[in-house]
């Protein structure tokens, strides 16, 4: 093929146009709703790890794709799971520790850039000061203000925007932010999220936990939390409880640390008292993420809690309807 023909072929290819979630919905039959599932994007901690990214979870339900927390590395896992930033419709944050929200910027900017004004604004929910954080990131005078201005005003960026299906004048990224507190209930198309209290690092950060209920089942996520009656009440009777499991019981640095983060024996009691069907352990430190230690923790939990216990892994997908677990991609090493 001559170089001129090759260039003409590249210029005419539609590959630069990114299908959006709205396109997918329009093309799909009305009954083609996604069954409720949750994918563990990041099951690690703030500590560096090549195996476990920081906190992030992806829920598929109906026509919506919801992320709960989006820490460093979570967005990479989202792409590995077969999803795109433009697929995400809602983002919820339990608290604003960096290991739970650092990829928020990547999600918003990549979704805005690839979506080319053809996707609805991202719905964002989180504790204060999520609104101020959003403005400081994406506002005119925000951290990414000069980047956003360049992508809106430079001719080359405008050309790329139009190639992706956009129509000038390009809008700024404008996440629709709602600050939430304990007791809030957010309703979607066939789902409802209830906001509960998490016991972690108050009063310096407001810390929340979430529960989603649908006709197919229920999932509760503690965020970061030590042992508290609030989690027992929020998780009552749910199909899946995803709980922080930071330490082996007795190895916490201090009593204060235990109250903020808990341990595996605390989690066993919470799961039992809440009457959940499945307990998923996450936010796992390297000191316990080892052969024999993992098995010992699961065994000791099962001495108290008689439901299913799952050692969470990045890219593990769970469906509460049948308690089925599948790995999207096996962890290396």
Which residues fall in each region the model found?
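N-terminal signal peptide c-region/cleavage motif recognized by signal peptidases
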Residues: 17-19
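A polyampholytic, Gly/Pro-enriched intrinsically disordered region
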Residues: 327-333
């Amino acid at each position: 093929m001559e170089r001129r023909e090759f260039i003409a072929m590249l210029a005419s290819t539609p590959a630069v146009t990114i299908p959006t979630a709205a396109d997918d919905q329009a093309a799909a039959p009305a009954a083609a709703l996604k069954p409720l599932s949750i994918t563990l994007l990041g099951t690690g901690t703030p500590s560096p790890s090549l195996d476990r990214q920081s906190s992030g979870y992806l829920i598929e339900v109906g026509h919506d794709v919801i992320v709960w927390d989006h820490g460093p590395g979570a967005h990479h896992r989202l792409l590995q799971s077969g999803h795109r930033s433009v697929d995400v419709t809602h983002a919820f944050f339990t608290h604003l520790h960096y290991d739970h929200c650092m990829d928020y910027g990547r999600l918003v900017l990549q979704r805005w850039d690839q979506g080319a004004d053809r996707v609805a604004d991202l719905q964002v929910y989180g504790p204060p000061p999520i609104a101020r954080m959003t403005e400081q990131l994406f506002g005119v005078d925000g951290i990414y203000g000069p980047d956003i201005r360049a992508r809106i005003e430079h001719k080359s960026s405008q050309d790329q925007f139009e190639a992706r299906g956009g129509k000038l004048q390009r809008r700024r990224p404008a996440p629709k932010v709602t600050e939430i507190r304990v007791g809030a209930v957010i309703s979607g198309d066939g789902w409802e999220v209830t906001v509960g209290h998490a016991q972690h690092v108050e009063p310096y950060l407001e810390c929340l936990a979430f529960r989603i209920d649908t006709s197919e089942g229920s999932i509760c996520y503690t965020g970061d939390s030590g042992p508290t009656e609030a989690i027992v009440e929020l998780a009552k009777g749910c199909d899946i409880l995803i709980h922080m499991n930071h330490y082996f019981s007795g190895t916490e640095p201090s009593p204060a640390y235990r109250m903020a983060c808990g341990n595996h024996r605390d989690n066993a009691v919470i799961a039992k008292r809440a009457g959940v069907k499945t307990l998923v352990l996450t936010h796992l430190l390297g000191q316990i993420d080892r052969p024999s230690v993992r098995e010992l923790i699961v065994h000791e939990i099962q001495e108290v809690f008689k439901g299913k216990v799952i050692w969470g892994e990045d890219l593990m997908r769970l469906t509460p309807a049948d308690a089925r677990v599948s790995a999207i991609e096996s962890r290396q090493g």
